[in-house]
């Protein structure tokens, strides 16, 4: 098998579907020991195997994040994929609610920040540690009715930029991947990336030499007449 990795450990959030699910499968097939994190264990039970264990956690709940860290605080962590994300249904700013806006930030910014912060000691033990944030082109190019989602993804971009300045002193690389439309269970499009496309990108970033950091990746489907 190509791209085989031995004795590496990864954490993937939002593992119950789409990009997270595909990433857990690909990394485990490549030799990673993967901890797949999801709010709903019933949706990740099919991932359990020799290289995969699952953990139930809500990324918006600080107490649950801390309990998760306490369980795994002694591991050497090589890769953290902050994939859990999302927002409420599309709405205009004039109709936005504080609860939805705050929850979008907790999912996309506050939760991933806290998770990354806690696991720094585990990643410092790795020969080459990487944190990957799955963002969206919507954070760079806001659109009407993007509301809490596009604003939260813009906040994630600022978080990643700050971490990229601060985390190299701990030997940790930080990358943000911004896809366009992804073909998922919720969103079926003829012109869209697949979850597997994203998983391949994540594995590639994680495989780079420790002195090479990819700051930011924008990925789109190629429009073709063929």
Question: Residue ranges of each PLM-predicted region?
Answer:
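Conserved glycine-rich cofactor-binding loop
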Residues: 16-17
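C-terminal helical subdomain
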Residues: 176-177, 189-226
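Active-site-adjacent segment of SDR/Rossmann-fold oxidoreductases
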Residues: 141, 162-172
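Residue(s) in the substrate-gating loop at a strand-loop-helix junction
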Residues: 136
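Substrate-binding pocket helix/loop in short-chain dehydrogenase/reductase
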Residues: 91-93, 100-102
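Active-site helix of classical SDR
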Residues: 116, 152-153
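A short, exposed helix-loop element centered on a Lys and neighboring polar residues
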Residues: 116-117, 161
